[in-house]
Amino acid sequence: MIKRVNKLVLGISLLFLVISITAGCGMGKEAEIKKSFEKTLSMYPIKNLEDLYDKEGYRDDQFDKNDKGTWIVNSQMAIQNKGEALKIKGMLLKIDRNTRSAKGFYYTNEIKTEKYEVAQDNQKKYPVKMINNKFISTEEVKEENIKKEIENFKFFAQYSNFKDLMNYKDGDISYNPEVPSYSAQYQLTNDDYNVKQLRKRYDIPTNKAPKLLLKGTGNLKGSSVGYKKIEFTFLENKNENIYFTDSLHLKPSEDK
């Protein structure tokens, strides 16, 4: 009888040990993912994007020794109301640390998917450059609303703040060492600072609080080949989609 009890106690102890180790590994990977993103997100807000001319980033053997690198920043909002096309608006900017110049494009898109048909992509690009932290069209823009949107555009990196990133709890963690790829997803509230900032700047047609997804590929410690992006998903289903995505990373310059 005593032997059976001892075996039972031993079995339960081993079970708790396995559970603890598994949970510990999960928490460890979550902390790694957060730290990986914190390297970039701790710079937010970058109110003046010209500060990036003097900002170092992760470098590996993909960089030429004389190349300071180019920061690539991209922010976009996508909204699909029921029965309508997915409407996307955003801007991509390449900030060259070698030439201390920045150029890119503002873009709009409407993606329509009819029954039994392939999605129709209607992307339009409007070339821009940045001077004195302001965005200027480099080609004539006939649409007055697009002109204003370009002039008033702000990247997420300019107004967001992730000082509480390490305090986010109960994340849904995914890690695939084969790719490698990794992600951490958190349910936010409408009281979250960054959620308030997005609602202040965009007409978001839902009161649902979003989920925040931190997603990346490549080495967790850093990679110029992989990517990192963050996504706020307010709605995601067959008929409606509302999400905001943002990314900022240093890449080898194209002319080096």
Curated annotation (Swiss-Prot):
It is a lipid-anchor. Pfam families: DUF576. GO terms for cellular component: plasma membrane. Residues 1-24 form the signal peptide. It is found in: Cell membrane. A lipid is attached at residue 25 (S-diacylglycerol cysteine). InterPro entries: Csa (IPR007595), Csa_sf (IPR038641). Keywords: Cell membrane, Lipoprotein, Membrane, Palmitate, Signal. Belongs to the staphylococcal tandem lipoprotein family. NCBIfam families: SA_tandem_lipo. This is Uncharacterized lipoprotein SAS0073. It comes from Staphylococcus aureus (strain MSSA476).
